[in-house]
Curated annotation (Swiss-Prot):
Species in which this protein is naturally found: Xenopus tropicalis (Western clawed frog)
Protein name: CDC42 small effector protein 1
Boundaries of every CRIB domain copy: 30-43
GO terms for MF: small GTPase binding
Tree of life domain: Eukaryota
Amino acid sequence: MSDFWHKLGCCVVEKPQPKKKRKRIDRSMIGEPMNFVHLTHIGSGDMGASDGLPRAGGVQEQMRSKCGRDRQWSNSGVL
């Protein structure tokens, strides 16, 4: 009898669960920004450097002067 259950188990295959469809987001679901503080504009000349890496020093200095804080900006986000 155990041979019967073994053979039956080999024939029954679990169907994969259908992927849940992600809810689409449209413009009506997006609200206004909260706690937004505009610090500065960054132009193409501010970020490009000859070696392909961004020059963050000047931009960081602009941001520091705009926000009125002596915050040390991290270079970890620089690519």
